[in-house]
């Protein structure tokens, strides 16, 4: 499979918000539930509500304002997660699910809001290995890479390509890890 130049231009609409799109590549580190930039500044944190079922996670900014809510569909055999803008469970942005129940390599599909009734072809694909905790995120079923993640020393390192919504990518990374590990990063 051909690798894409990470400095190449991507023309992608912001999925979570335009404030999360940068014209240059962005490296983030993820340790536990905290996401930091290359200078060590906290960018995001993922919170798990204390009460209720533990099938929900909330991505918050450094001021604790909710950016997206990730909610696992409990009755799904494909580890389906639905993602909503902010804390409003009426404003669904996208759905993430395992492509099949039995896999040697993990393949997860992402369906944007407009594509959720058919789910015939995904809008994004995440491919990775369970044991290595590494993955690559592609546009649809193509070879166009928009982000790559690998495991560093006790943390994950993510490279998000230019013009890609990094809140969207961080959300996908957490869901991918939850699907793989069952516990989070």
From Swiss-Prot:
Disulfide bonds: none annotated. Might be related to the phospholipid scramblase and tubby-like superfamily of membrane tethered transcription factors. This is Protein LURP-one-related 13. The lineage of its organism: Eukaryota, Viridiplantae, Streptophyta, Embryophyta, Tracheophyta. PANTHER family: PROTEIN LURP-ONE-RELATED 13 (PTHR31087:SF152), PTHR31087. It comes from Arabidopsis thaliana (Mouse-ear cress). Belongs to the LOR family.
